[in-house]
Amino acid sequence: MTLSFTARWRDELPATYTALLPTPLKNARLIWYNDELAQQLAIPASLFDATNGAGVWGGETLLPGMSPVAQVYSGHQFGVWAGQLGDGRGILLGEQLLADGSTLDWHLKGAGLTPYSRMGDGRAVLRSTIRESLASEAMHYLGIPTTRALSIVTSDTPVQRETQETGAMLMRLAQSHMRFGHFEHFYYRREPEKVQQLADFAIRHYWPQWQDVPEKYALWFEEVAARTGRLIAEWQTVGFAHGVMNTDNMSILGLTIDYGPFGFLDDYDPGFIGNHSDHQGRYRFDNQPSVALWNLQRLAQTLTPFIEIDALNRALDRYQDALLTHYGQRMRQKLGFFTEQKDDNVLLNELFSLMAREGSDYTRTFRMLSHTEQQSASSPLRDTFIDRAAFDAWFDRYRARLRTEAVDDALRQQQMQRVNPAIVLRNWLAQRAIDAAEQGDMAELHRLHEVLRQPFTDRDDDYARRPPEWGKRLEVSCSS
């Protein structure tokens, strides 16, 4: 089957990009590709044949129909207007046309210098490409909206960061790479007609049902806000901290995008800061809902030329509604509740307080809770708490709440185990795969990708255990 590519972004939004070709790496070679995703997209296996060189995965060739561009956008970074940004090392190669008429961006990260590289070198490093590939695939299999990773290429090109590292490329796929920052760019350039063109593009291709509706812009922004709310709720329930929620890292489609200094909670710490460059804690775990609203307010500002203020405020209210509703639903599922009762939040917050005091492992606590038998006062989870009396008191109230519903243990446990993962991408697991890959051993990279495809399956090995002490102290930065 021949892959078909279109160039809607290039054809319809000429002010938003610079056309250019990728700059290949030295002795580039394919070290991993997403076989499952490739099969779903009917990508010929021959394209992954290492004897053909790095090919499209290393920017050495293009597939028929590809028209590469680097996109321009701006944004607020750490709450401060940063001006023009853009694809400083990534190139949108083309948009794959799928059988249902939708498209999928093929975006090559680490593809070389662009007009938007600023002081950078246009490169990505092996460390960061591995982290992003693992994180985006982990999030996908957790059921959280995200970009996808298709391939990783390594090379003999040295790249200087804090130390000298290995140049690499990642093929990232997404329904769209449209960001809040695209709209900010033209708003601050005082070109509202181009802001409106971006909105028209989004509606035409992603919400075509609203094209001929008079209030299409208001409906569209409401949906952007609601999707953002649901996304943040998913992050909070699974214990994911993005690390760098700048407006240029926010997706119009409500996707998790731009994996940099992210982290999944190990010990439950609501103030967890994943990014060691975030000295003020702006992007700490428990501040993500507020930051997302702030970012939506910045996007709303760009839409004032063609959406009424009242409509924008209603949309921002939709964010709060979507966030709280989805978060509440998901947390009740994690606790095994099938109905909503007025004291559920009290019970949840009491558990969080216990976990915070004890430094309980976030993922393991909820996974172990999902094995609870409501008639049994004993639980393996009890042994993980130092203050057994406090846990016992909470656990008695929890079991009493379970008994208010006519749901047997098997059904409830089944529901809980579908939403409480046994496996998340802990930083130490990613680092172990990176360390091996930097020594030329890709086995752990491949193994970890396979493990992350089944996050809701119990395991009795390193992948499901608490991290070693050194693994809790890993510092992650934006220096990708």
From Swiss-Prot:
Disulfide bonds: none annotated. GO terms for molecular function: AMPylase activity; ATP binding; magnesium ion binding. Pfam families: SelO. The keyword tRNA processing does not apply. Its EC number is 2.7.7.-, 2.7.7.108. InterPro entries: adnlytase_SelO, SelO. Its cofactor is Mn(2+); Mg(2+). Auto-AMPylation inhibits the UMPylation of chaperones. The UMPylation activity depends on Mn(2+). Auto-AMPylated under high ATP levels. Is probably auto-AMPylated on Ser-479 and/or Ser-480. Auto-UMPylated. Mn(2+) binds at residues 249, 258. Changing residue 248 to A: Does not exhibit inhibition of motility under iron-limited conditions. Belongs to the SELO family. Nucleotidyltransferase involved in the post-translational modification of proteins. It can catalyze the addition of adenosine monophosphate (AMP) or uridine monophosphate (UMP) to a protein, resulting in modifications known as AMPylation and UMPylation. It is involved in stress resistance and plays a crucial role during infection in regulating essential bacterial processes, including flagella synthesis and iron uptake. This is Protein nucleotidyltransferase YdiU.
